[in-house]
Amino acid sequence: MLRLVVGALLLVLAFAGGYAVAACKTVTLTVDGTAMRVTTMKSRVIDIVEENGFSVDDRDDLYPAAGVQVHDADTIVLRRSRPLQISLDGHDAKQVWTTASTVDEALAQLAMTDTAPAAASRASRVPLSGMALPVVSAKTVQLNDGGLVRTVHLPAPNVAGLLSAAGVPLLQSDHVVPAATAPIVEGMQIQVTRNRIKKVTERLPLPPNARRVEDPEMNMSREVVEDPGVPGTQDVTFAVAEVNGVETGRLPVANVVVTPAHEAVVRVGTKPGTEVPPVIDGSIWDAIAGCEAGGNWAINTGNGYYGGVQFDQGTWEANGGLRYAPRADLATREEQIAVAEVTRLRQGWGAWPVCAARAGAR
């Protein structure tokens, strides 16, 4: 008899244990977008929700419904309601309820997608305790964006927000009138100037460096290129300033030598006594040369007058020209002007009466 009793007891315990295992289940409980895995012996949705510390209000969204039986691996979603104090374009606020977690979701849920939050961002979380949510309605404005004019009808709290909503946000050093923080009003005209700094790399010639070789037998104001050298190539990076897509300036900021240049050789005169003073009134002398000799400083027509300002040989020699060259046409422009200045000091501009007057010399 004892053996029969023990056997029956073991059978009952085994059945009870199997039932407990079968009744235990793991489900996913998602509350306001946050998911958690919970283990429970409860069977109804509402019991599992309350078991985990959440109450359900009439305004809340619960799926599946409260009385639905739950099975292992099921998912329960609870979206709790929260109050919003909605005001449109500054008018009196009214209270509405939403189960949305963000401002953007709330506007969609309330069928107010044609409005925009006046202060909060669309991604702002709506706290369970609720919040004040001033919104603005869509306005029609004229937008001149870097010369492209169009009319847009969008909801935005300010100029910067409207540009973002239009898909053309302010970037870098862009300038906008009215100011970016100015509130949007119906019929507003917005002018945007797009200022950009971009980097551009171009392959350019690399001028050769010049090696200067002194020649004591040649006048100081003269240079002779013995070897012009060979230009190389370089990649030059420029910082390019643009206004509304039009380049307004550039500065080189870096360069990389691709092909080195072969240096040039320049012979420079260092002959003593051939110093040339700085040219004064160069434009007047060029004008006189243009009148006297067609601007040709090396002219020699055989008429007894030489060079740009048409020295005769006696005047050239008397005013120190031989220190530079036997005749004026064999001297450089600067050397001829040096002798011409000596002549002017002695004879005045009257040495070139017609052409000096035409040049405006006094």
Curated annotation (Swiss-Prot):
Record flagged with keyword ATP-binding: no
InterPro entries to which the protein is assigned, alphabetical: DUF348 (IPR007137), G5_dom (IPR011098), Lysozyme-like_dom_sf (IPR023346), Resuscitation_pf_RpfB (IPR051933), RPF (IPR010618)
BP term (GO), one: dormancy exit of symbiont in host
Gene Ontology MF term list: hydrolase activity
Uses: A promising vaccine candidate, an rpfB-encoding DNA vaccine induces elevated cellular immune responses, confers modest but significant protection against intra-tracheal tuberculosis challenge in female C57BL/6 and BALB/c mice.
Lineage: superkingdom: Bacteria
Keyword match Nucleotidyltransferase: no
Cysteine pairings via disulfide bonds: C291-C355
Lipidation (N-palmitoyl cysteine): C24
Disruption phenotype: Not essential, disruption of rpfB alone has no effect on growth or survival in liquid culture, nor in mouse infection models, colonies plated over a 52-week culture period are visibly drier and more friable. Alterations in gene expression are seen. All 5 genes in this family can be deleted without affecting growth in culture, however triple deletion mutants (rpfA-rpfC-rpfB or rpfA-rpfC-rpfD) are not able to resuscitate spontaneously in the presence or absence of O(2), and are attenuated in a mouse infection model.
Gene3D superfamilies for the chain: 1.10.530.10, Resuscitation-promoting factor rpfb
Enzymatic class: hydrolase
S-diacylglycerol cysteine lipid modification positions: C24
Description of what induces expression: Expressed in actively growing cells.
Chief location bin: membrane
Keywords annotated in UniProt: Cell membrane, Disulfide bond, Hydrolase, Lipoprotein, Membrane, Palmitate, Signal, Virulence
Family membership noted in the UniProt record: Belongs to the transglycosylase family. Rpf subfamily.
Additional notes on this entry: Was identified as a high-confidence drug target.
Physiological role: Factor that stimulates resuscitation of dormant cells. Has peptidoglycan (PG) hydrolytic activity. Active in the pM concentration range. Has little to no effect on actively-growing cells. PG fragments could either directly activate the resuscitation pathway of dormant bacteria or serve as a substrate for endogenous Rpf, resulting in low molecular weight products with resuscitation activity. Reduces lag phase and enhances the growth of quiescent (1 month-old culture) M.tuberculosis; works best between 8 and 128 pM. Increases the number of bacteria that can be recovered from a 3 month-old culture. Stimulates growth of stationary phase M.bovis (a slowly-growing Mycobacterium) as well as M.smegmatis cells (a fast grower). Binds N,N',N''-triacetylchitotriose (tri-NAG). A fragment (residues 194-362) hydrolyzes an artificial lysozyme substrate 4-methylumbelliferyl-beta-D-N,N',N''-triacetylchitotrioside (MUF tri-NAG).
Subunit details: Monomer. Interacts with RipA.
Record-given protein name: Resuscitation-promoting factor RpfB
Organism per entry: Mycobacterium tuberculosis (strain ATCC 25618 / H37Rv)
